[in-house]
Amino acid sequence: MAKKIQAYIKLQVKAGQANPSPPVGPALGQHGVNIMEFCKAFNAKTQGQEPGLPTPVIITVYSDRSFTFETKSTPAAVLLKKAAGITSGSARPNSQKVGTVTRAQLEEIAKTKQADLTAADLDAAVRTIAGSARSMGLNVEGV
C-alpha cells in the first residue's frame, strides 16, 4: 500500500548550504521530519550546482514522518540578474532599464531552465526567458 501524504513543503534553499536554521528547520520541524537527514541529502544532491544559488525544492512528507524531495532549477530572475551583473531589477521596467542581456546568455539560461518550463523547444524557452528579462527592466539584444 502507498504511503499517505501528510504535507507538501515548498522552499528555496541555497545549493549546498542547507542547514537546520530558518527557513528549513521550522518548516520541517512542524511536520516531524528529521531535519539533519534532509540537509545532508539536499546538500549531497546539489553539490554539483554553483554554491549559494537559490534552489527551489518541493518536499513531500508522509504520515510515517519519512520524506522525499524534488529539486527544481534556479529561478530565471536570479540567473538573469547574474548574467546582467545587477543586484535587483528595475522598479519601473518600461521606462528605466538597468542592464542588458544577449541572445547567447538567454540561450544558456533557457538550457538550464528547459526541464522546468512548458516550452516546446529551445527557441520558445528563449522567448519565455526574454519576457522575464524585459519585465525586470533588462534590454534584450538579438531577440
Swiss-Prot record:
It comes from the Bacteria. Signal peptide: none annotated. One or more lysine residues are methylated. InterPro entries: Ribosomal_uL11, Ribosomal_uL11_bac-typ, Ribosomal_uL11_C, Ribosomal_uL11_C_sf, Ribosomal_uL11_CS, Ribosomal_uL11_N, Ribosomal_uL11_N_sf. SMART domains: RL11. Pfam families: Ribosomal_L11, Ribosomal_L11_N. The keyword Ribonucleoprotein applies. SUPFAM superfamilies: Ribosomal L11/L12e N-terminal domain, Ribosomal protein L11, C-terminal domain. One of its GO terms (cellular component) is cytosolic large ribosomal subunit. GO terms for biological process: translation. Keywords: Methylation, Ribonucleoprotein, Ribosomal protein, RNA-binding, rRNA-binding. GO terms for molecular function: large ribosomal subunit rRNA binding; structural constituent of ribosome. Forms part of the ribosomal stalk which helps the ribosome interact with GTP-bound translation factors. Belongs to the universal ribosomal protein uL11 family. HAMAP family: Ribosomal_uL11 (MF_00736). Part of the ribosomal stalk of the 50S ribosomal subunit. Interacts with L10 and the large rRNA to form the base of the stalk. L10 forms an elongated spine to which L12 dimers bind in a sequential fashion forming a multimeric L10(L12)X complex. This is Large ribosomal subunit protein uL11. It comes from Pseudomonas aeruginosa (strain ATCC 15692 / DSM 22644 / CIP 104116 / JCM 14847 / LMG 12228 / 1C / PRS 101 / PAO1).
